Every structure is written in structure tokens, then in C-alpha cells.
């Protein structure tokens, strides 16, 4: 008989790399054109500097593209909340430094964008490792500036035409903050029960619940978020009176 050891099988990185020629001198506009070409898929935009993250964030705000920022210059609490909003799809895009290229818990992604090129092959490889894992395919996009050469490890990437835009849907999810957590003996089931019974929502309207030691975060449709805050704020969850608010950026 033939013995197959499945533990020896290794996940194959199913990754394609593509270059995007800047359509104008405005690199930020090319980035937005690419995001609009890709539609409503979640992805990470990698930058080298905190200043770059800030400028990309301001531009995406103007274009009404929901996003979160993630860098070493932020407080741990703010980084954690950025990831929560990205995981539950309140944010479509995560704008990040290389801190997000390893060791963070995010769902399987279809794409990443190198807004600024990695300084080393190792950083480039770690960034690309966020996509194309396990069974799904992913694409890493590199923004190619005119008269600026790409590193050797990127030069074989095929150029892609991004002139065609996908239909972008409006933001669906919003994140609610609850001021009670595990230390208050609150469970995910307790939170779901509160939203079903007192919030009068359906199962389809309850998104991802993330439970922490002293608080919790719940994704709900943006269209009913304020309504749920009015219904549930200052109610009792287990024995604790909790605040329920919309999580601000």
C-alpha cells in the first residue's frame, strides 16, 4: 500500500505580480484608479513612510474609499482597532507600513499594492506573502513611475491595463463598540442575543463579533448602525450596564 503523509505537503504560493504604469504624474490618482479597477475586494496598500500613509489616507478620504491605517507610529490600541475594521469589512483598504507584512491576523486577500517599492527583496517577499496563500490566488501590484527603474526581482512582472472600472458598492458594514468584555463574564453568545432580542436584527444583519478583555466590537449594516446605538446604548449585558457607540476612525 502507498502511504501519503499530508503533513509534508506545503502550501503553494499562488501569486501573480503585475506592474501598473502611472497614468499621470499624480501617483495618488493612479492608486485610486487601480482600487476602482479592482472593485470592492479588500486589500493592503503598502507604504515605506508614515508621511506616505497620511497622504494616501487623505486622498482616499476625498474619494470616499473606506480604509484604515496601520503603522508603528500608532498606539497599539489604534492598530488593533484598524485591523478589527479591516477584518469585518468596515474598511475595504488597509494602508500600512511593512509592520503589516508579517505576524498580523487578517483574512485571505486577493491583492496587495506596493504604493512605494520595498527597499529589499526580503521585505518585498513578506508583503507578497499576505496574498495567494492556501487555495486562493492573489495578485501583487507594483506602481511603476516613469523614468524610474524597478528592482531586478520585479522586472519580469507583466504590465496591466486598469482603464476599466468595476462597479463599486457603497460601504455595507459599520463597527459598533461595546464597553464590556470577557472580564465582565460576557460571551459572544450574550452579545448576539442582545442584538437579536433588543436590537431586533436578523442573523444576516449580524457581522463579525470580536470579544476582548474589557470591550467588544460588532459589525452591523451601516444603514441601521445609529438606530442600534439608540436602542442598545446604556442597556445591561449580563450584570454590566454597557455603552454602545459607533467606533470612530
Model-derived regions: residue spans:
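Post-DEXD/H (motif II) to motif III coupling segment of the RecA-like Helicase ATP-binding lobe
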Residues: 1-11, 148, 154-155
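Short glycine-/polar-rich loops that comprise or flank the Walker A/P-loop
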Residues: 1-2, 13-17, 39-41, 63-66, ...
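Conserved interdomain hinge at the start of the Helicase C-terminal
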Residues: 13-61, 200
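Conserved helicase ATPase core of P-loop NTP-dependent helicases/translocases
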Residues: 53-59, 65-97
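A short beta-strand element within the Helicase C-terminal
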Residues: 102-117, 139-143
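Conserved segment of the helicase C-terminal RecA-like domain
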Residues: 119-161
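Non-catalytic terminal extensions of ATP-dependent helicases
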Residues: 161-249
Amino acid at each position: 500500500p502507498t502511504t501519503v503523509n499530508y503533513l509534508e505537503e506545503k502550501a503553494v504560493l499562488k501569486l501573480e505580480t503585475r506592474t501598473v504604469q502611472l497614468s499621470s504624474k499624480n501617483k495618488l490618482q493612479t492608486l485610486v484608479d487601480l482600487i476602482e479597477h479592482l472593485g470592492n475586494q479588500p486589500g493592503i496598500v503598502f507604504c515605506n513612510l508614515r508621511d506616505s500613509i497620511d497622504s494616501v489616507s487623505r486622498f482616499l478620504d476625498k474619494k470616499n474609499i473606506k480604509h484604515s491605517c496601520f503603522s508603528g507610529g500608532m498606539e497599539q490600541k489604534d492598530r488593533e482597532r484598524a485591523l478589527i475594521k479591516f477584518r469585518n469589512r468596515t474598511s475595504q483598504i488597509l494602508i500600512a507600513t511593512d509592520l503589516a507584512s508579517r505576524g498580523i491576523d487578517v483574512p485571505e486577500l486577493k491583492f496587495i499594492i506596493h504604493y512605494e517599492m520595498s527597499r529589499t527583496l526580503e521585505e518585498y517577499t513578506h508583503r507578497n506573502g499576505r496574498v495567494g496563500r492556501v487555495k486562493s490566488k492573489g495578485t501583487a501590484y507594483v506602481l511603476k513611475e516613469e523614468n524610474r527603474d524597478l528592482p531586478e526581482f520585479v522586472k519580469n512582472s507583466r504590465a496591466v491595463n486598469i482603464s476599466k472600472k468595476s462597479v463599486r458598492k457603497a460601504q455595507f458594514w459599520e463597527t459598533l463598540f461595546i464597553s464590556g468584555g470577557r472580564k465582565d463574564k460576557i460571551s459572544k453568545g450574550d452579545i448576539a442575543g442582545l442584538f437579536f432580542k433588543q436590537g431586533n436584527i436578523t442573523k444576516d444583519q449580524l457581522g463579525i463579533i470580536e470579544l476582548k478583555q474589557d470591550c467588544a466590537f460588532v459589525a452591523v449594516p451601516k444603514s441601521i448602525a445609529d438606530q442600534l446605538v439608540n436602542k442598545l446604548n446604556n442597556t445591561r449585558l449580563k450584570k454590566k450596564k454597557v455603552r454602545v457607540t459607533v467606533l470612530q476612525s
